[in-house]
């Protein structure tokens, strides 16, 4: 159900739900996705699942900070919360080109949120066996992984809208969307898993500092523009 709530953010041509704070709603729903996973693991009454919960909480706290800061930088640049205005802002300039470092960090953060290789540490390490789905089979197993892949499809759409500024019914949008999905799927068979301590170190020592630098830089640019023109 929470995975379905994400699609309310998608700016359909005939979408009657004209949300003003779409980006804020997006962050809120993404954050809610963690709680069903925690409940599913806790109900399974399995030691491996409990270990997965502990690892999940620390990992989510670390990288949700990056996700929130990147979205905040985007809001600071466009000075609006609507995805449609985000498209209008990128008609002549694409975020993919002049803040490409944030684009790469955003992809890493999404891979962690989606539990994809090489960051599927909460369910992929040998000491955790299979993570939270260890005690589930048949319908429950299908529902768990169906929600995961629904999130995968939606997040790639939001990524293209935020950083590419593509019209969401165009041929180029669909083509780049399929290419991104293909890359995301084949990553599982190409990359090796990173060590957990390295993952946390990269977040708090390297990536967070870089994102904060961009935040301060963008804020100073906006202040300078305001002083010059107003």
Predicted regions and their residues:
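Core, highly hydrophobic multi-pass alpha-helical transmembrane subunits of bioenergetic inner membranes
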Residues: 1-230
């Amino acid at each position: 159900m929470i995975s379905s709530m994400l699609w309310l953010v998608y700016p359909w041509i005939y979408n009657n739900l004209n949300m003003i704070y779409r980006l804020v709603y997006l962050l809120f729903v993404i954050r809610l996705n963690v709680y069903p996973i925690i409940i599913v693991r806790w109900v399974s009454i399995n030691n491996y699942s409990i270990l997965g919960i502990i690892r999940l909480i620390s990992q989510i706290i670390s990288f949700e900070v990056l996700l929130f800061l990147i979205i905040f930088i985007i809001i600071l640049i466009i000075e609006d919360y609507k995805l449609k205005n985000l498209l209008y802002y990128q008609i002549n300039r694409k975020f993919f080109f002049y803040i490409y470092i944030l684009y790469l960090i955003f992809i890493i953060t999404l891979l962690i949120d989606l539990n994809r290789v090489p960051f599927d540490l909460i369910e992929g390490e040998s000491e955790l066996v299979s993570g939270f789905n260890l005690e589930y089979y048949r319908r429950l197993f299908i529902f768990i992984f169906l929600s995961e892949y629904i999130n995968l499809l939606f997040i790639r759409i939001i990524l293209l809208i935020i950083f590419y500024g593509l019209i969401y019914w165009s041929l180029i949008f669909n083509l780049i969307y399929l290419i991104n999905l293909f890359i995301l799927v084949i990553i599982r068979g190409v990359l090796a898993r990173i060590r957990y301590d390295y993952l946390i170190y990269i977040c708090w020592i390297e990536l967070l500092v870089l994102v904060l630098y961009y935040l301060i830089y963008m804020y100073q640019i906006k202040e300078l523009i305001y002083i010059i023109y107003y």
